[in-house]
Amino acid sequence: MPLRTLNLDGDRQADLSVHGGPYKAVYGYPSEHYPFWRSELPGTDLPWGMFGENFTTQDLCEGDLHIGDRLQIGAAVVMVRQTRTPCYKLAAKFQRDDMLERFLISGRSGVYFSVEEEGTVASGDSFQFLSRAPKGLTIEDMNRLIASDRYNRTLLDKAIATPALPEDWREHFLERLARMTSMHST
């Protein structure tokens, strides 16, 4: 299946104001998280792809991925770009009003990739690192900034300094840092 700049062929995002685009071209979700959700949501059928992922990954958890890491899958090259902040559709899919909060608090967000080089991918293809951005913010760090440690100055500075972070996130974190600075100066 062709992996293109904006998505996998045939994949259509419903609301392009919050889904898709070059920094959210494809979504990966770790297979390692499914046992957690099976214990959290007993009786819920959780087949691969239940979280809306294009790729159910293995050995690519949030703490291991830095924004800016480049990986190959099949003939395509992707870059780690950002975490997932879920919308109401996740709660609707699971038929649980508390699903968004549970998802955020869990830190089990998965990752959005941009497509750096288009190519063909197939079921069973594995991700291989081409280059790492070890000084970049991890997806786990980004989750902390969003859900549990919003005013961590070290992480905010690191996020702002991460070259591959999408500009809208950089602006968001700069605004938060400015608010933080103004609160402390008064």
Residue ranges and their predicted role:
Residues 68, 118, 123-125:
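Loop/turn positions that initiate beta-strands
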Residues 85, 108-110, 118:
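A generic structural motif
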Residues 109-112, 124, 139:
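Hydrophobic, well-ordered secondary-structure segments
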Residues 97-114:
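A mid-sequence, solvent-exposed acidic-amphipathic segment
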Residues 59-61, 107, 117:
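Short loop/turn positions at the edges of beta-strands in beta-sheet-rich folds
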Residues 127-129:
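Hydrophobic beta-sheet segments that form the core/acyl-binding groove
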Residues 1-92, 98-99, 131-186:
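Electropositive, beta-rich accessory/interaction domains or terminal extensions
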